[in-house]
């Protein structure tokens, strides 16, 4: 690869999660935003600056990030960008949200967890 693709999969071991990044599948507890993912998406929507494209449109920006052991978000990347600056705006908004997530849990310990999130953007020009 070119080194830009997000790495999926588990690089820790079952007995010592270490700093490997886990996927949501098979985790004891998935990472969670306070109030749930709907709450997180509402916050994203409130802070998202929509482009002026002169027509109504619904687009999806697919983002990838890592929920760290302390609940912060890192490695924020756009996996699929519909254009119009929406990918860059998605990254800006995610970085601006300071509320911490509850981290993923494996073997009763917080672990770094990969998270994929589609953000639907509705432009009502």
Locate each region found by the language model.
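Charge-biased low-complexity segments
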Residues: 1-125
